[in-house]
């Protein structure tokens, strides 16, 4: 099962990914949390570019796609194949939103990611940019060049407009506990279908 958590910076993706993983592991489900860009060579190169000189949007797309292909081949597909729950803190919709906000065609970006397995549930944590930026400052970080009100507004608009069948929008202006409860309920809906009668005990524990 593949769970992707998306949203603009400051939406609470990392917090939710950790909370969901803790809950799922607690009821005996093998769960892996990963992120994009990854800590692999391509993801590392992308982060280094912020210091050594930014890539162009087209170059960033190339590096992101290389990073994602490796991620899919080395972790996502193998772990799903063994029956694990894979939780991703950002996935291909982030590239579509952020590079789309930089002016690249959204349809072309989606097509370039056709190789990436589609999530069973895509949790879009929706917050206004002003709240996302406030949270970034509150956690002691300094917003990067992507993290401006104007740019995050464009990204948010693209996230909300994306037509992906598994997308579920969660109001992430609420507190972390409320967001977690909403997300867990959506994940349980998918697990109920996936596990069937055999998963009754697991679902009962998750609901407890």
Swiss-Prot record:
Gene3D superfamilies: P-loop containing nucleotide triphosphate hydrolases. GO terms for biological process: dTDP biosynthetic process; dTTP biosynthetic process; dUDP biosynthetic process. One of its GO terms (molecular function) is dTMP kinase activity. Its EC number is 2.7.4.9. One of its GO terms (cellular component) is cytosol. Pfam families: Thymidylate_kin (PF02223). InterPro entries: P-loop_NTPase, Thymidylate_kin-like_dom, Thymidylate_kinase. It catalyses: dTMP + ATP = dTDP + ADP. The keyword ATP-binding applies. Keywords: ATP-binding, Kinase, Nucleotide biosynthesis, Nucleotide-binding, Transferase. ATP binds at residues 7-14. Coiled coil: none annotated. The keyword Protease does not apply. Phosphorylation of dTMP to form dTDP in both de novo and salvage pathways of dTTP synthesis. NCBIfam families: DTMP_kinase. PANTHER family: THYMIDYLATE KINASE, UMP-CMP KINASE 2, MITOCHONDRIAL. Belongs to the thymidylate kinase family. This is Thymidylate kinase.
């Amino acid at each position: 099962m593949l769970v992707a958590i998306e949203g603009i910076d400051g939406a609470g993706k990392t917090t939710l990914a950790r909370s969901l993983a803790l809950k799922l592991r607690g009821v005996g489900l093998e769960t892996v949390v990963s992120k994009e860009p990854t800590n692999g060579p391509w993801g590392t190169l992308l982060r280094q570019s912020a210091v050594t000189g930014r890539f162009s949007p087209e170059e960033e797309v190339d590096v992101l796609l290389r990073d994602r292909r490796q991620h899919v081949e080395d972790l996502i597909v193998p772990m799903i194949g063994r029956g694990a729950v894979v939780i991703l803190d950002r996935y291909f919709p982030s590239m579509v939103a952020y590079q789309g906000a930089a002016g690249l065609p959204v349809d072309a970006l989606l097509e370039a990611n056709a190789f990436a397995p589609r999530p069973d549930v895509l949790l879009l944590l929706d917050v206004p940019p002003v709240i996302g930026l406030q949270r970034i400052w509150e956690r002691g970080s300094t917003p990067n060049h992507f993290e401006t009100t104007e740019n995050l507004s464009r990204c948010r608009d693209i996230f909300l407009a994306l037509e992906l069948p598994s997308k579920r929008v969660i109001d992430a202006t609420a507190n972390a506990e409320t967001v977690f409860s909403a997300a867990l309920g959506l994940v349980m809906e998918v697990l109920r279908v996936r596990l069937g009668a055999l998963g009754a005990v697991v679902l009962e524990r998750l609901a407890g």
